[in-house]
Amino acid sequence: MNNFETKAVKTVGAKLIHYAYKNPQKNVPKLLKFAKRLAGNMFTEATFTAPIDIVNNKENTWHDYFYSMLDDIDRDYLESLLLTFAFDCGYIGTKTLRKNREIYKCNIPWVILMDPTSACNLKCKGCWAAEYGHKSNLALDDMRRLIKEAKELGTHFFMFTGGEPLVKKKEILTLCKENPDCIFLAFTNGTLVDDAFCEEILKCKNLSLALSIEGSEETNDARRGEGVYQKTLKAMEILKKHKCLFGISVCYTSQNYDAVTSDEFYDKMIANGVKSVSYTHLTLPTKA
């Protein structure tokens, strides 16, 4: 697909996604019909039929979640995220990845994780970043080169970890703006989230966050430091106000697993605007 064809297909896709907002039950099937015609046999039949059931069937587990996304997330921002995820990451990315996997006879990842910096403004118990030092950094040009080479192979999805990646929020925003055909997700402690940053997220339209939190205030601050829990909730408040998409990343331990899997915890996170949750185990630092 040449540049003209790519632009034309994305333009049609953008209009269909925008159109689907007006009447999801009627227009989502039309959007998926277009997507299926474009993708051919690249994906399974369920890829295109399952979303229709989600939209129309109130008994479907994902039904309320789908409509909450439409209500809670900024429309232009969400439309752009959906288009980039479906077309650039899903269609173009998958097609290129599969081709290059055959050429190079090796796996090529659909998503790449990178640490812009090992620097962090917290010192959480057991965190490798707190033990290994704060002086390791990826230069902006190095990250640019990594993304450029990854896109050539078919990877259009990038995750930022650390350290605390928002220590380098300026560089992250630059990368997002320079690569509108990519999706970016930053794992962050949330303490550096502010109104200005959220406004930039909405301008980029391809960045979302996963905030670290670990259950109750007691279990969270026992490992992350006094006052961090309230700062994380404040970050959620700001992100929700700006209608940005965000989730949480939970590190589970023997000390907090009850707290981070309780209905009370889930209900509170949902009320605070959280749209996804991922669980990670504790990675202890080791000597080289």
Give each language-model segment a name.
Residues 1-24:
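Intrinsically disordered, low-structural-confidence terminal and linker regions
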Residues 30-196:
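Conserved alpha-helical substructure of the radical SAM core
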Residues 117, 253, 285:
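Residue-level recognition of the GNAT/N-acetyltransferase active site
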Residues 126, 215, 287:
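Flexible cofactor-recognition loop at the NAD(P)H-binding site
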Residues 140-160, 166-279:
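Radical SAM/AdoMet-radical enzyme domain recognition
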Residues 280-288:
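Conserved small/polar residues in nucleotide/adenosyl-binding loops
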